[in-house]
């Protein structure tokens, strides 16, 4: 079992996370990371003997642990699908600071290769979120293929909205995404709603 982080370690990882979110993995220099943590480079290397990659690995592990606890677990938890997605919307809003925080997975992904140091973990994270969203859509009554399509679209909208927030310097795209997420996963297909309306007026 991994040794629990101390509060000091949690704060250190949080400060490193902000640098990677703002600058990206390749752009983050040791000088930037040291300045953000308030430690000298030698002290950082003492904490992280394998350097920047180890720092990013711990940041990613902490983020994925948070996601498992606050996103994946509620999606599979108790309550109606609507209640669970409402909790997830609230937690996503907090994690991404209402769209002001960039997507860590995107900022750690290598632009040059599909086999970067974090590629496997990032892929698993996306697949886990798609699977969790898909299960919720299935529980709401959608067919497997429809549920998968809704889940993939929801994940695309999540990360696309964060990219737009960063580019536009506005949190509006993320707020629009959060408002639309319950409907993206749970709402009846428009064709079904139209058929019900037609039957009602027959």
Give the residues covered by each predicted segment.
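N-terminal intrinsically disordered/low-complexity leader segments
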Residues: 1-7, 189-202
């Amino acid at each position: 079992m991994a040794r629990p982080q101390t509060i000091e370690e949690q704060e250190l990882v949080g400060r490193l996370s902000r640098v990677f979110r703002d600058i990206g993995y390749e752009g983050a220099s040791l000088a930037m990371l040291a300045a953000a943590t308030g430690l000298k480079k030698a002290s950082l290397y003492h904490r992280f003997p394998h350097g920047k990659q180890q720092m990013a690995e711990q940041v990613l592990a902490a983020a994925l642990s948070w996601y498992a606890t606050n996103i994946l677990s509620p999606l599979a938890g108790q309550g109606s699908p609507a209640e669970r997605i409402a909790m997830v919307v609230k937690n996503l809003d907090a994690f991404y600071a209402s769209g002001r925080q960039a997507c860590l997975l995107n900022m750690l992904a290598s632009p040059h290769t599909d086999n970067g140091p974090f590629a496997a973990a990032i892929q698993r994270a996306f697949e886990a979120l798609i699977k969790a969203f898909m299960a919720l859509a299935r529980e709401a009554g959608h067919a497997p293929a429809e549920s998968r399509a809704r889940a993939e679209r929801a994940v695309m909208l999540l990360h696309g909205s964060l990219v737009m927030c960063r580019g536009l310097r506005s949190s509006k795209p993320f707020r629009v995404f959060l408002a639309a997420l319950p409907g993206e996963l749970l709402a009846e297909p428009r064709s079904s709603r139209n058929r019900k309306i037609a039957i009602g007026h027959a």
